[in-house]
């Protein structure tokens, strides 16, 4: 199962866990997802974050909705930084889920409650 391959942890001590930060003004939601906030992640052709995805699962929804995906196709300093900003509109509460993919260490996840 895919769920058995996705790793998680505390982003303050694990450089692969995506950090989710959001601001909500009315029904407009701005979400920033980054990898390596406390402990920088390498960005070389040999070891890098390939992509980040953000999902929103409304409290009354059956399935999460893919808000967006950002692929990082350039690797080496100073070309890319594993950080993405997403905007969407909702009046609903729910969960924000982020996935990131490290080419060596696989899939990583995090989640926060959207109020």
Curated annotation (Swiss-Prot):
Cofactor names: Fe cation
Protein source organism: Pyrococcus abyssi (strain GE5 / Orsay)
InterPro entries linked? Desulfoferrodoxin_Fe-bd_dom, Desulfoferrodoxin_Fe-bd_dom_sf, Desulfoferrodoxin_SOR
Q: Describe its assembly.
A: Homotetramer.
Q: What is its EC number?
A: 1.15.1.2
For the protein in the UniProt heading, the enzyme class is oxidoreductase
A Pfam family it matches: Desulfoferrodox
Q: What is the lineage of its organism?
A: Archaea, Methanobacteriati, Methanobacteriota, Thermococci, Thermococcales
Q: State its role.
A: Uses electrons from reduced NADP, by way of rubredoxin and an oxidoreductase, to catalyze the reduction of superoxide to hydrogen peroxide.
Gene Ontology terms, MF aspect: iron ion binding; superoxide reductase activity
Record-given protein name: Superoxide reductase
Q: Does the keyword DNA-binding apply?
A: no
The family classification in the record reads: Belongs to the desulfoferrodoxin family.
Task: Summarize where Fe cation binds, as residue positions.
Answer: 14, 16, 41, 47, 102, 105
PANTHER family named in the record: SUPEROXIDE REDUCTASE-RELATED
Q: Which reaction does it catalyse?
A: reduced [rubredoxin] + superoxide + 2 H(+) = oxidized [rubredoxin] + H2O2
The answer to whether the entry has keyword Calcium is: no
User: What UniProt keywords apply to this chain's record, in alphabetical order?
Assistant: Electron transport, Iron, Metal-binding, Oxidoreductase, Transport
């Amino acid at each position: 199962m895919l769920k058995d391959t996705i790793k998680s942890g505390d982003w303050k001590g694990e450089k692969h866990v995506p950090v989710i930060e959001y601001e909500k003004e009315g029904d407009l939601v701005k979400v920033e997802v980054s990898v390596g906030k406390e402990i920088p992640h390498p960005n070389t052709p040999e070891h890098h974050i390939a992509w980040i995805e953000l999902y929103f699962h409304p409290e009354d929804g059956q399935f999460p909705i893919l808000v967006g995906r950002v692929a990082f196709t350039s690797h080496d300093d100073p070309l890319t930084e594993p950080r993405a900003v997403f905007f969407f509109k909702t009046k609903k509460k729910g969960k924000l889920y982020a996935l990131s993919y490290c080419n060596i260490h696989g899939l990583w996840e995090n989640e926060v409650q959207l109020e």
